[in-house]
């Protein structure tokens, strides 16, 4: 099953029947996923609050999205927990944490699926990365591990920012981007 995964594809008997369809599996807390279930099975509110906070932290740590599901009547009955969850997510800052609808994530994934990119070794030992999209690469980001590569150079169609352990190569609203990656001389494979 897909339970707990990020946005993914739906395969039936090993076949991708609808390549335009994206699915967003629910992420449960153990056996339960809704406020009604938490209430029916006496899951303490403090545990649910901790779980919601850990979901936000997981999303930030792994740069991913997970679906947390709630029926409106159940959310209303647990309004204190709902408000705590929303406040915790918002407290992380809009530049680090965002709320998305399933539709918005599916649109992004469909756009991402159209990105074509390649990396070519250069005689200098660097890698040349080239990416393209039929309409725009806007919103696309390449995470480059700093321990393995120096700051990307010869960048066109993108900006480079410091993402902690990664260089973030963020595409502009262009059809094609390029950048070069030079190996970090201090890199030691594990």
What name fits each language-model region?
Residues 1-59, 108:
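Active-site-adjacent pocket scaffolds in enzyme catalytic domains
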Residues 4-6, 46-134, 148:
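C-terminal domain-boundary segment and adjacent tail
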Residues 132-151, 179:
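Surface-exposed beta-strand/loop patches in extracellular or lumenal glycoproteins
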Residues 20-21, 126, 176:
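A residue-level signal for beta-strand positions that form part of recognition/binding surfaces
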């Amino acid at each position: 099953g897909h339970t707990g995964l990020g946005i993914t594809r739906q395969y039936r008997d090993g076949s991708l029947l609808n390549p335009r369809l994206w699915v967003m599996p629910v992420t449960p807390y153990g056996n339960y996923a809704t406020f009604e279930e938490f209430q029916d099975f006496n899951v303490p509110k403090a545990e649910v609050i901790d779980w919601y906070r850990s979901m936000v932290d997981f999303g930030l740590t792994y740069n991913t999205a997970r679906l947390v599901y709630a029926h409106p009547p159940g959310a209303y009955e647990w309004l204190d927990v709902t408000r705590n969850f929303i406040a915790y997510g918002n407290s992380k800052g809009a530049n680090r944490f965002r709320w998305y609808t399933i539709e918005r994530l599916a649109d992004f994934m469909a756009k991402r699926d159209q990105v074509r990119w390649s990396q070519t070794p250069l005689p200098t030992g660097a890698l040349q990365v080239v990416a393209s999209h039929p309409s725009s690469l806007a919103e696309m980001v390449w995470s480059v591990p700093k321990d393995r590569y120096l700051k990307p150079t010869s960048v066109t169609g993108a900006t480079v920012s410091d993402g902690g352990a990664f260089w973030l190569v963020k595409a502009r609203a262009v059809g094609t981007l390029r950048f070069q990656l030079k190996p970090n001389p201090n890199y030691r494979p594990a």
